[in-house]
Design a protein with these regions (language model features):
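ATP-dependent carboxylate activation and anion-phosphoryl transfer catalytic cores
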Residues: 4-7, 17-18, 24-237
Length: 237
């Protein structure tokens, strides 16, 4: 933390749903968070990452066959980086990222899939600040956005990825056609009314219990305009 400077993101080295992840802003909070992690997860290790404030987040889902990479979709989050991806509304395809940032993300995705020797699905999350692209994490598996993208594009991605994982086919064996007229918005579903006393502020720990899909024809749609108008790049605003 002294090397990268506060705020920092403190988390267990392996975690699902952002459990026990916290953004801390000083030494006292850092000490409390580290002790809390070791108390609840004594066999884990602690990672301390620089936290980029007021930063956009986007993610790529892709299929890699050892030679070629197919970008299934790129989703841009409405909420800033620091909000768990499962709690953020997200738009497919992206709507405000520059072509330079998108190309950089795709280049990084190919290099990461190649370096990890992936066969099948991979999800990579990025933070984008002033067109500078940072890799948050790479998950060499199906993510919660995989079925969302398959549904939105009406493409049999799970079947394709399964056959590539088994070594039956290569990407070149498939004629993949994406069918989406407009945009698809991922909408998190919360059940706060069933959990009284839960902190409703969004952060790196996931709190949603599901998600829905909303299709729009263009960015003039009232639903999207309302989401975008209320967009804040600050946490806990």
């Amino acid at each position: 933390a002294g090397r990268v400077g506060f705020p920092v993101l403190v988390r267990p080295s392996y975690v699902l749903g952002g459990q026990n992840m916290r953004i801390v802003i000083n030494d006292d909070e850092l000490e409390r968070q580290v002790l809390s992690i070791f108390k609840h997860l004594p066999d884990n290790r602690v990672l301390i990452d620089q936290f980029l404030e007021r930063t956009k987040e986007a993610e790529i889902d892709a299929i890699y066959d050892g030679e070629d990479l197919h970008i299934m979709g790129i989703m841009e989050h409405i909420e800033p980086a620091g909000i768990h991806s499962g709690d953020s509304s997200a738009v497919l395809p992206t709507y405000s990222l520059s072509e330079q940032a998108i190309q950089t993300m795709c280049d990084h995705a190919h290099k990461i899939a190649q370096a990890l020797n992936i066969r099948g699905l991979i999800n990579i999350q990025f933070a984008i600040k002033e067109d500078q692209v940072y890799v948050i994490e790479a998950n060499p598996r199906a993510s919660r956005t995989t079925p969302f993208i398959a549904k939105a594009y009406q493409a049999p991605y799970l079947n394709i990825a399964s056959r590539i994982m088994l070594g039956v086919n290569k990407l070149r064996d498939f004629d993949i056609v994406k069918k989406l007229d407009g945009y698809a918005i991922k909408i998190p579903v919360f059940s706060f009314e069933k959990f009284p006393g839960v902190d409703k502020r969004l952060g790196p720990e996931m709190k949603s219990t599901g998600e829905a899909i909303h299709f729009i024809k263009d960015l003039k749609d009232p639903y999207f305009r309302e989401l975008d108008r209320n967009r804040s790049m600050y946490l806990y605003n």
